[in-house]
């Protein structure tokens, strides 16, 4: 995905990120993470670099959250400029501590930027998982829509954000 972002013009437009139906992102491959400390370190480094690239991208990035967003998937949402989820029985949250894993400090700081103050403890240190409808209050999502309207709604938002003057995105 990082290579695709390199091909996006930095002076116009916007980007729309979507996952597969039912799963926006489940985060890191736990089999790879548990295979060796070196593999885990490389995966975390690559994941953080992707999140940072999205977070600092010079154009607006809209996330169409098509289902669950777990662990790195939740942090991916935190990296985007506007996040739209679908109604349904899906969960969003950072469950690393429940899996006896740590959240690397740079990723933690990125999440703290987007998550609301009343929910930072619950979302990050208590590893609370939120329903889609409840994910707006902590700051994982900006809005929720019907499943069949997700892509239409997200594309309209991406087109709208593409029309804005963008000096803030380039800072």
Where do the protein language model's features map onto the residues?
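Glycine-rich beta-to-alpha transition loops that act as phosphate-gripper elements at the mouths
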Residues: 64-70, 123-128
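CoA-thioester-processing core
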Residues: 50, 70-123, 157
